[in-house]
């Protein structure tokens, strides 16, 4: 559910992987925009019609994306009543901002009017609907469906609205469920943007990514899918889950191509706020850390300080998600073909993902410890050369004599 600016990507991503996707949104205008931009194939007004079309395409093994005009809570409950159980159920509705969440019984236009007339009543209705939606997702999970939160803060918002925490957290967030093993390798949504605006630069960098990360099936699969299916919007750019070691090697190789004139350049390297060592969010990215460090906000600040010391071109301390409940660090590093850029990239592209590996190693993840010790699968033999302790916080020794100071 949720076909907005971020949620609309669910249909495109699903089709890229050969899936049949049914996406629900209460605002017909939003679905129509997704269709106009080729993010969605068609729009229907009933779940029954969507199911019929979905089954037809499943039989033919043909991917398709179907937008259903309706409220997520209503449609999820209807699907359960009809025992329609998809393989995966999630949502990208604006739960983190309940005033933008459309309550049951309202169209997008009606919600706009209601919101302006009685903000308090609107929020009450939105939160009531949100709890119905989450309970439906929990029921899907109980019936064997892969159901999870996609980072919308739905569980936290429902808890704040009175839903018991134990009940709300019967589904996981996707970071704890699926992404954290990647974080342990320093992977995350690493981004490069071709400032020249020339699509040929992006094509050359796609080729370079495949060269640098040869044998990394995650990178290889993604680059080949992305260059085939994703259009260029504004400046040519790519996001890719490269990890510790890979990012540094790639960045230095890009700078070399700019020196040689094979890439017009410059190229800006950045990443999402959701990255291995850049965020603390106890209700999502950093939930259920083995050492109990869900709330430790030192990590993103340390990330920012390290990037500053490494010569990063831009650093931003930010907070979003659940209106002040999280802290994260944004960065940008520039490759312009100069020797100075080599120095900056060598350092910044090491520490930015490296501190994420350290964070997860300190929390107790063995795969992250392996990366730190030079045994990472994609790190190319690189290790993280700082003092490390693999003990719980109350047993860590910081004094030179090895004595723990309280």
Please name every model-derived segment.
Residues 1-2, 69:
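Extended hydrophobic secondary-structure segments that form protein cores and membrane-embedded regions
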Residues 15-17, 80-85, 106, 163-166, ...:
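Short, solvent-exposed amphipathic alpha-helical segments in soluble enzyme
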Residues 48-250:
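Core active-site phosphate/anionic-ligand binding loop and the adjoining beta-turn-alpha structural block
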Residues 18-19, 85-88, 139-146, 261-264, ...:
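Structural alpha-beta junctions
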Residues 76-79, 158-161, 277-283, 325-327:
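Short, solvent-exposed polar/charged micro-motifs at secondary-structure junctions
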Residues 3-59, 63, 90-135, 170-182, ...:
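Catalytic or ion-translocation cores adjacent to nucleophile or general acid/base/metal-coordination motifs
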Residues 1, 219-325, 332-338, 342, ...:
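Conserved mixed alpha/beta core segments that line enzyme active sites in large multi-domain catalysts
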Residues 356-406:
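Extended hydrophobic packing segments that form well-structured cores
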